[in-house]
Amino acid sequence: LYTFGMETSFFRFASRDNSKQYYNLILSAVIAVSGAFTLFFVLFATPLINLLGYPGRESYLVMLALVVALDGIVAIPFARLRLERKPRRFAFVRMANILLNVLLNVFFLLFCRDIHAGKYLTFLQPVVHVIYKPEFGVGYVFLANLIANLAFIPLLWDLFRDFRFRFDAAAFRPVWLY
């Protein structure tokens, strides 16, 4: 939803001569849409979460919105890696994200839970009590996913570093229509 088909448009319009122009244009559009959707979910988190029947869990919705926004935003740099035929880097970054997500889920949902409960490594309880609250529950799944997705930024930094926010309605129209 956050990429609204722009990944496909990037492949269609980004040739070797003008890939930078379309990269900036399309990534700018995806960042703007992701920002707007995320802002909507942040501003209306309370009524939306109440409507869903999970009052008091606004943080879940905010983290979910941020995860989806980051997924949308990094889709274009990933498309650029594919266009530039860099499969090893693409695979490395994707696998690093998956591995970090799994490790963080194990850390929060098993390791911290068990230390908090006093099952082992009780000397770590003071530290774990600061970072782990059992009542947060499934929120740790969202948190792990958010942290893992934030790791995309340093892993893809060179693709963000040369990005320049750009919007040209005339150039964007055919991209949007595609």
In which residue ranges do the predicted regions lie?
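Interfacial transmembrane-helix starts/ends
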Residues: 15-32, 176
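Interhelical loop/hinge segments that connect adjacent transmembrane helices in multipass membrane
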Residues: 115-144, 151-178
